[in-house]
Amino acid sequence: MKFKVKIKALEIALLENGASYTTLQKRTGLSSKTIFKVYHGKPVIPSTCVKIADALGVHASNLFERAD
């Protein structure tokens, strides 16, 4: 099962945390390719969702939804 990001929710979480694309990459340890996929609404695996949500201090369900 894969998930895609809720863009507005991600933008809000990033603003609230003073985080950027680069900051998120450093906090999660994910590759720039993976972060790019997330930012562009491409489907990602659950562990990626959890890493991003944890880095931003939110629950993964607030940032991601199932991809069709």
What are these regions (language model features)?
Residues 23, 34, 62:
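Residues in the helix-turn-helix
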Residues 29-44:
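Recognition helix of helix-turn-helix/homeodomain-like DNA-binding domains
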Residues 57-68:
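Short C-terminal boundary/hinge segments that cap the last helix of small helical domains
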Residues 27, 55:
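Residues within the alpha-helical elements of helix-turn-helix
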Residues 1-23:
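A short, Lys/Arg-rich alpha-helix, primarily the initiator
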Residues 12, 26, 37, 65:
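DNA-binding alpha-helical recognition surfaces that contact promoter or target DNA
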Residues 41-54:
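Short, basic-rich loop-to-helix N-cap that marks the start of a DNA-contacting helix
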